[in-house]
């Protein structure tokens, strides 16, 4: 049996790394989307995938899970004019992604940060 973490990561990997439109099989039929630029429903995810720019990339960072919620810290390049750091929050229901929220912010490099820290560290960078 897959964990909620594995389900959320499969959704992110399928959509943004593999660019597999069949990833929507892992979303509920009444999938709720809270990103204001993406409609509700798995069809919106399927439509989004082929529209990703050729130079688009996604890098997963920290993952935290509690109950039916999974939060993933990630770096999106090509989503916006500059790289974006995001926290994606997924609600899992019946082994599928049922709901999604995200908070996105343009990346500020450590050299430009008041504290000298980067906004993102991939697991392999720790």
Predicted regions, residues:
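C-terminal and inter-domain tail/linker signature
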Residues: 1-126
């Amino acid at each position: 049996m897959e964990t909620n973490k594995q389900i959320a990561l499969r959704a992110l990997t399928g959509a943004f790394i593999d660019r597999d439109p069949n990833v929507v099989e892992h979303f509920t039929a009444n999938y709720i989307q809270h990103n204001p630029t993406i409609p509700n429903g798995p069809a919106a995810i399927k439509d989004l995938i082929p529209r990703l720019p050729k130079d688009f990339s996604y890098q997963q960072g920290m993952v935290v899970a509690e109950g039916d919620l999974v939060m993933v810290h990630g770096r999106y390049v090509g989503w916006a004019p500059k790289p974006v750091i995001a926290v994606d929050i997924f609600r899992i229901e019946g082994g599928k992604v049922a709901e999604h929220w995200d908070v996105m912010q343009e990346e500020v490099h450590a050299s430009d940060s008041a504290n000298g820290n980067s906004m993102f560290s991939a697991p392999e960078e720790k």
